[in-house]
Structure formats: C-alpha cells, structure tokens
Amino acid sequence: MNQHTPAAALACAGLLGYCRAGFEKELAAELDDIAAEAGLIGYVRAEPDSGYVIYETFEPTPLGSFGESTDWRRPVFARQLLPWFARVDDLPERDRATPIVEAVKASGQRFSGVMLETPDTDEAKQRSGFCKRFTEPLAKALEKAGCLRSSRAGLPVLHVLFTSATTAWLAAGQPGQCSTWPMGIPRVRMPSNAPSRSTAKLSEAFMMLLEEGERDSILRAGQRAVDLGAAPGGWTWQLVNRGLRVTAIDNGPLRDSVMATEMVEHLKADGFTWRPHRPVDWMVCDMVEQPSRIASLMAEWVATGRCRYTIFNLKLPMKRRVEAVEQCRELIRKRLASVGPYDLRIKHLYHDREEVTAFLTLKR
C-alpha cells in the first residue's frame, strides 16, 4: 500500500448500528432520521431479532460527509454506531483473513487497531470464542499488509462484525465518535453484596451517560442524593458505594445490607409527592410508572433546582417505544423552555429491557 486515504475521504457505504435483539425497528427509525439530517440518500435494512441494523447509501459517501451523524451517543437504541465501508461474503473456513485484508487494502485506509465482534444474540455469541482466537492472526495479517499502524494516534479502529460464520461487515470507528467497549457493551461487575441486580443498571448508566471526566467532577463522595422508589435498595446501594449520602424514598422496605451502611435515611413516602427541604446534588428514580409521569417529575425537580443532576428510568410500551421516548423529550423541553438550556441524554442500556435510562441537568 503506497497510497493511503485520509480518514475523512474513506468511501463509506452507510451506517452500521448494534442494538439489543428485538429493537431493530426502533434503531432503524432513528438511523433513517439521522441519515436524512446528514443529507444521506439510501435505505435501511433490519432483520427482526438480529441485533444490528444497516443503513446503506445508494452511492459511496466520503466519511467526512457523515459529520456528527456517526456519533454513537445520538441514537437512543444504538449500543454502537459506525460508518461501514465493505461487506465480505463467502469467507472460506480455512482462510478468513485474506479476503478481509484485501477488502481493507482496497479501501486505502489505515487503522490504529482492530476489534472483532458479533451481534448480541444467542446464535451469534457462539462465534465469540472464534473472534478472540482470530483477533491476533488478523491483526498480524493487516499489519503485514500495511493496513495497521497502532502507533498512529487519530486513526480509526477497524471493526469487523461477523453476522455469520461466512459474512463480515467492515466499519471504521472514529476516535470520540464510537463506543470503545466491544459490541458497545460496558463490562459491569455485579457485586455479591448488592441488594438487587438493578444496581448494575445504575452503574452502567454512569458509564454510558457520563463522560469519563464528568464522572470524576459531578459524581463525588460526600454529595447528597435522593432515590425515589428506592426499595429494595439497588440504586441506593450504588450511590452509597460511591460515597454519597442518600435519602431513600419508598413505602416498601430496604434490605438490611443497605441500611447497615449508616449512610442512608429511609423515609416511607410517595416518590411523586415528597420533596426535599433543601436542594441535593443527585436524584435518581427507577419507579414503575407511565414514562410521561416520570419525565414530568424529573423535569420539575431540575427546573425548580431541587437537584442538579438526575438519572432516571422510563418504562416503555412495547409497540410505541420511539413515540414514548419522543413524548418524554417534548414534556421535558416544554417544562425547561423558560428555565434555560439543558442537557438530556437517553440510552437503551445493556441492563435495560423494555425501558430506557436518561440523564438530565441544566447547562451551566
């Protein structure tokens, strides 16, 4: 390879998004909107329960033309979002590396590293062992061909998504635009002494919804927090574990392990009507209720200054997931319109099922 394409000029064929199996329709709708905003012309392909969605442009499009449309943080239902540039079919069982290397060479693009992935489905996970074994041989073959320069900062990462044993999609993960976790799934450790599995959801929310620098600056030991709908204490435990003092609001009981920390005040009250005597740093909420009611309550807390930051969960109706999310966005927008600019981030987490998790704060 004597000539190499600048990353912005890499000819791409569309967008590749990873999602939870069963949420392809929702991600497809989001990719349609994102592509339209970016001025891309093409179509979506989404197979039910496949765990991924393809947006394919009618003409090759320079990577630079995608702009911020490839930012994985934008679509709610995407775990990962990448511009893809090639699909390699009919991979021979004894030599999968050569066709992939040839496709990468044909693109003219160098990469800083390579990540082999599968969709998050039971069928695809059977190839995860192969991906681990094949990563090093493929990396060596790419390096030998001049396609890999691990010492070059700023180059994209080559993502190879095996949707079957014989088909691989090749995509370019740009620094700062794509998720750095394999398959877009952060590895969250489930502590053995946590009162419920929901603690892992809040831990993932901190990882997914807050930037690394933010986690250190706005989530600190010694802060005060409120947990609405706290029982049995999974989210409260996560906050306490990070050094926050928590007022837990729930008519139900909290686990003894939560109360034993001596950093929790448990008040038996209704999460919708209770208010703190003075502002707190954080409010979190995982109450089972209509998403519109939760969104309105969260916006009210932020608008009135009762909390600076909030992370909350929205339970979605099965057949109108996208519409429910947009309704909540609009409710929050209307309530905060007269207050000032705000930052709302919503993601369908790995630990979410028929729900999404959101972060909200006023911009300061």
From Swiss-Prot:
Which is one Gene Ontology cellular component term of this protein? cytoplasm
Catalyses: cytidine(2498) in 23S rRNA + S-adenosyl-L-methionine = 2'-O-methylcytidine(2498) in 23S rRNA + S-adenosyl-L-homocysteine + H(+)
Annotated active site: 315 (proton acceptor)
Give the GO molecular function terms: S-adenosylmethionine-dependent methyltransferase activity
Concerning Gene3D superfamilies, the annotation shows:
3.30.2300.20, 3.30.70.2810, Vaccinia Virus protein VP39 (3.40.50.150)
Biological process, per Gene Ontology:
methylation; rRNA processing
Q: Which EC numbers characterise this protein's activity in its record? A: 2.1.1.186
Q: Which UniProt keywords apply?
A: Cytoplasm, Methyltransferase, rRNA processing, S-adenosyl-L-methionine, Transferase
State the compartments where it is located. Answer: Cytoplasm
**By its UniProt entry, which SUPFAM superfamilies does this protein fall under?**
S-adenosyl-L-methionine-dependent methyltransferases
Keyword Transferase part of the UniProt annotation? yes
Residues annotated as binding S-adenosyl-L-methionine are: 198, 231-234, 250, 270, 286
Self-association state and partner proteins as the record states = Monomer.
UniProt xrefs under PANTHER family: RIBOSOMAL RNA LARGE SUBUNIT METHYLTRANSFERASE M (PTHR37524), RIBOSOMAL RNA METHYLTRANSFERASE FTSJ DOMAIN-CONTAINING PROTEIN (PTHR37524:SF2)
UniProt family annotation: Belongs to the class I-like SAM-binding methyltransferase superfamily. RNA methyltransferase RlmE family. RlmM subfamily.
The UniProt function text for this chain reads: Catalyzes the 2'-O-methylation at nucleotide C2498 in 23S rRNA.
User: What is the protein name for this chain?
Assistant: Ribosomal RNA large subunit methyltransferase M
- The species is Thauera aminoaromatica
The gene name on file is: rlmM
